[in-house]
A protein has these predicted regions:
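Glycan-processing catalytic domains of CAZymes
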Residues: 28-409
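Bacterial N-terminal signal peptides that target proteins for export
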Residues: 1-8
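Sec-dependent signal peptide cleavage junction
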Residues: 19-26
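Bacterial N-terminal signal peptides
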Residues: 8-17
Length: 409
């Protein structure tokens, strides 16, 4: 998930079986939705050539956006299990788009990327997949998880990545919820769910206009409204929204982020959001005069290839195990193609040490399972549980600074 490029086109290639689909946009639009399974709405942008940094684009009709059941007025119980901003907490990014139960998809993985130990039972559709991964996250000492969210079928963003005939971004959520419910019934420790808002879906929206702000918001609404509030990750009573970068945003300012919380409070019992923004959100974009943008937290993506970022303005200790996308990416660093060796775990361990020493209260592991960029720390055939164990060792050390996290209900 590199700035402006990412491996979205690769993910689509890996995910899609070769079958006849209902719609096809012109070929050569990398990173866009250019295949639409039967029964899904065709994105308004399917036949446009979208480019990062392109001109501002109105998101158009939001008729495709449908909230889940956990939203007012029909749902009224918004009691949360909340952490405190004084706690030391750890999280990771969960790329739940995989379905390796299909032999063709698995074949495109094998020999190129790390593979989970039981790929025949590794799918976004399977509750047991999420339950196993969530339990391993708990074993790593993590407090909450950040599933990457790419919106609903039909949204105008550049990436919809349908895993035909299923749509992973929405259809994976019920399986995650069932996994949490199973653990709850079994008396397992809770793992809360926050939202990793993949802003590459924003399709050059202007987030200072009424239409742009509402598009920005409905993705948050439709993610959280699909998950029972007791499972939401919250800090100081505010559900977490973790923003990726601004490459696919044409304009924004402080009002863009304020709108998220204002609208969320209207729909979810007065709750406001705990917004952690990527470093590109520090100042407005496309707005004259420029202005500062603030929120609850700040991180910088890129620890996996570049190492620990010591910039003093950051509130999140971002760590990563290394990075490798040169199996398919050519052109060197200037094209965001990197091969950063894991050094047998030493690259990751050094960053974990720096994270503990930094004094920052939030640690984010980049990533749990973005296999196609070689940033995975989950259990795999290639690395076993090495990175889970390393994470646990240093998360325990981090939390030892203040004791266990405080959870209020």
């Amino acid at each position: 998930m590199r700035r402006g490029l990412g491996t979205v086109a690769l993910v689509i290639t890996l995910a899609l079986p070769v079958i006849a689909l209902a719609q096809e946009a012109p070929t050569g639009y990398p990173g866009q939705s250019n295949t639409v399974p039967v029964g899904f709405p065709t994105p308004e942008t399917a036949f446009e050539r979208l480019m990062p940094g392109g001109p501002a684009r109105d998101p158009g009709s939001l008729a495709w956006a449908h909230p889940g059941p956990y939203i007012a007025p029909n749902w009224t119980d918004f009691v949360l299990r909340s952490f405190s901003s004084g706690d030391y907490l750890a999280t990771t990014y969960y790329f739940y788009w995989h379905d390796l139960t299909d032999p063709d998809r698995l074949g495109r993985f094998t020999g190129r990327f790390d593979v989970p130990p039981d790929p025949a039972h590794y799918s976004f559709l399977l509750p047991e997949t999420h339950q196993r991964e969530f339990n391993d996250m708990l074993a790593a000492g993590l407090d909450f998880v950040l599933p990457v969210y790419w919106g609903e079928p039909g949204h105008p963003g550049r990436t919809t990545a349908e895993t035909s005939p299923h749509y992973w971004s929405t259809e994976g959520i019920p399986a995650m919820v069932e996994a949490l419910q199973r653990n709850e019934q079994q008396g397992a420790p809770p793992l809360q769910i926050g939202m990793f808002y993949d802003t590459t879906i924003l399709a050059n929206a202007d987030l200072t206009t009424a239409a742009g702000k509402e598009y920005f918001y409905v993705n948050v609404r439709d993610f959280y409204s699909r998950i029972p509030p007791r499972f939401w990750a919250a800090i100081d009573g505010k559900p977490i929204v973790w923003l990726y970068d601004t490459v696919w945003v044409s304009r924004f300012d402080q009002s863009s982020l304020d709108y998220l919380s204002d609208r969320f409070a209207n729909d979810f019992g007065g709750l406001r959001l705990y917004i952690v923004r990527e470093s590109q959100w520090q100042g407005s974009k496309g707005v004259d005069p420029p202005s500062t943008v603030t929120s609850d937290g700040l991180y910088a993506w890129g620890a996996a290839p570049f190492g620990f970022n010591t910039s003093p303005e950051l509130t999140v200790a971002e760590v990563g195990p290394g990075f490798k996308n040169t199996q398919y990416c050519t052109g060197g660093p200037e094209r965001n193609c990197f091969d950063v060796d894991r050094q047998g775990g030493a690259w990751y361990e050094q960053q974990l040490k720096e994270a503990v020493a930094s004094g920052r209260h939030l640690l984010a592991a980049e990533t749990w399972n973005e296999f196609s960029e070689g940033t995975d720390i989950q259990e795999t055939v290639q690395t076993g549980r090495q990175y889970i164990d390393l994470t646990r060792r240093y998360v325990d050390e981090l939390k030892g600074l203040s004791g266990a996290a405080t959870v209020t209900e």
